[in-house]
Amino acid sequence: VANLTGAEFAAYDGQLPVIVERGYDAPCLAWKWEKLLAAHGETRFAATAATGKDRQGLAFELAALETMRKHVTPDQWMYVMDETVTQRVPDLLRDCPPPPLLAAEDFFPLLPAEVQSFPAFFLLGTEHSESSIHVDPFNWTGSNLVLFGRKEWVLVPPGAHDQEFRPARTTSGLPLPSFKYQETSRLSFWSKEGRKVLQRLRKKAPVYEGSIGPGEYLVIPSGWWHQARNTELTLAIAGQTCNAANFRSVIKETVRFHEHENRGRAWPAFEDRGVFATP
């Protein structure tokens, strides 16, 4: 859609993925790889290096990616996925604020500062790089804005078919801890095996596929499984929001984590209506 209004977004939110083609205007839309390299080539970023199904976490200066990106293959690539760089390099966030539709109603800033989530995630991937199949922490409503390059997507709603992904539950590592749900076998929806999984999934649930380019952003509904692949060198900024449509899921997911971590404490029963009931 183009020029989605606030009322239209409120009516949609939490139901289906949507690609917003226009309606975002910020200095970061002028960023290109060469400009980013000149400004932040000496900044260290957290990244993932892939060789086949092996993944290795590392950190390097951005300038090193200039050489690495020329030697990538479908089985060997690099993906910068840095949650904290906007705190270390504030001008990145200043030049690239969250999409207005998501920022208009966001309850996360109401939390105490020490447990607020990182406001944005810096994502810079070489050609062929891809995320895991995962669900975002807290079941928040996510966004992914492409500044340059192109990113392909597959999204699947939650349901009884979740076991197709062999999901593992780990800890998110965010300031306010939560569970993180992630496919464990390094499955790619774009692989031969992944296409077979999608064929089975389509018999049980809707599967959405699409792509976004410069200036476009995807809104990811609360609780949906998704995976992204970069078809060329691609810079994107991911964000999140807790709003009237998803705050029940966010609270429920927070309580679920702390119930698990603090078993000796008597927790109130949480109902999907968004209220705490006396046990």
Predicted features, each with a name:
Residues 1-217, 225-279:
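N-terminal accessory scaffold of Fe(II)-dependent oxygenases
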